[in-house]
Amino acid sequence: MAKNTDRICFLVLRLLAFGATLSAAIVMATSHERTTYLSLSIEAKYSHTPAFKYFVIANAIGSAYSLLLLFLPSHGSLWPLVIASDVVITMFLTSSISAALSIAYVGKKGNSYAGWLPICDQVPNYCNHVTGALAAGFIGVVLYMVLLQYSIYTKCCKSSS
C-alpha cells in the first residue's frame, strides 16, 4: 500500500510540475504587445529579451522532462540518475526564473541610473502576461523542489529502513 501511495504522490507532483512549467512557457511565449507612444511604435515581445527566451526554453525542457518521467517505472536502477537529473532541472529552472525576474523588474520599475524607463505603463497586457508566466514558473520551481525532496526521501530514506 505504501508503494502505491508513493507512486500516486509522485505522479501528482510530476503532473503539477508539468502543468506549471508548460503554462509558464506557453504564457511567456505568447506575450506580445504593440503600441504607439509619442509617435514611436513600441513592440514588446518575449523574444526581444534573452532572459525571457532562456525562461521559455528552461520551462519547456522542465515540462518535457516531467512528462517523460511520468512513464518511468517506479522501480528500477535509473532512480539515482533521476534524482541527479531532478537536481539539474531544479537549478536550471531556478536560474531561468532569476534571470527573468531581474529583467521583469527593470521593465516594471526602470533604472534611473542607467536612464532606462519603465515600460509597463505603455504595454500593460505584455507585463501582465510576463507576470503570469513568472508566477507559473515560480510555482514550477517550488514543485520541483518539493519533488526533489520527496524523491530523495522515498528512494533513499525509505528504502534503507
Swiss-Prot record:
Residues 29-53, 108-131 are extracellular. It is a multi-pass membrane protein. Residues 1-7, 75-86, 153-161 are cytoplasmic. It holds the Pfam family CASP_dom. Coiled coil: none annotated. InterPro entries: CASP/CASPL, CASP_dom, CASPL. Keywords: Cell membrane, Membrane, Transmembrane, Transmembrane helix. Disulfide bonds: none annotated. Homodimer and heterodimers. This is CASP-like protein 1C2. The keyword Phosphoprotein does not apply. The chain crosses the membrane at residues 8-28, 54-74, 87-107, 132-152. It is found in: Cell membrane. One of its GO terms (cellular component) is plasma membrane. Belongs to the Casparian strip membrane proteins (CASP) family.
